Amino acid sequence: MIEKVPMTAGGYAALEVELKQRQSVDRPRIIEHIAEARSHGDLSENAEYHAAKEEQSHNEGRIAELEDKLARADIIDISKLSGDTIKFGATVTLIDEDTEKKAVWQIVGEPEADAKKGRISITSPLARALIGKKKGASVEVVAPGGAKAYEITKVEWR
């Protein structure tokens, strides 16, 4: 059975943009670099050629990965979600029970997770601890850095 990849419409669009960039801009540029390096003669000691081939391999691998994720995408329209129970797409405000620090996280699909932008993967330890909980609940998260306790102070749909 093909496993679906949950993501927001914005996450899907970002993957499409990256795929198009890699196919229509990066791929031709890399092919040009390979041709240019090839014209310099002996390929066995041609570092420029080997670097371009490695870049091509990396780019083609990422293209295949993007095509796979887009083909398996399960786009979830967050604007149609509501309620006070945390699930995919929720934006959750937490207070660290030890430090009293506030943190805001949106639960998104794996391909669009970016901690710097406040977006955590639905498969992360924190998201797994939050799913199904409501405002006012306390959760304990066991992560590689140790156990942390949080209080859920707000659940939003943005």
From Swiss-Prot:
Coiled coil: 47-74
Recorded GO MF terms: DNA binding; RNA polymerase binding
Functional summary from the UniProt entry: Necessary for efficient RNA polymerase transcription elongation past template-encoded arresting sites. The arresting sites in DNA have the property of trapping a certain fraction of elongating RNA polymerases that pass through, resulting in locked ternary complexes. Cleavage of the nascent transcript by cleavage factors such as GreA or GreB allows the resumption of elongation from the new 3'terminus. GreA releases sequences of 2 to 3 nucleotides.
Protein name, UniProt field: Transcription elongation factor GreA
PROSITE patterns named among the record's database cross-references: GREAB_1 (PS00829)
SUPFAM superfamilies: FKBP-like, GreA transcript cleavage protein, N-terminal domain
Keywords per UniProt: Coiled coil, DNA-binding, Transcription, Transcription regulation
Source organism superkingdom: Bacteria
Pfam families per UniProt: GreA_GreB, GreA_GreB_N
GO biological process: DNA-templated transcription elongation; regulation of DNA-templated transcription elongation
Species per Swiss-Prot/TrEMBL record: Rhodopseudomonas palustris (strain BisB18)
PANTHER family: TRANSCRIPTION ELONGATION FACTOR GREA (PTHR30437:SF4)
Protein family: Belongs to the GreA/GreB family.
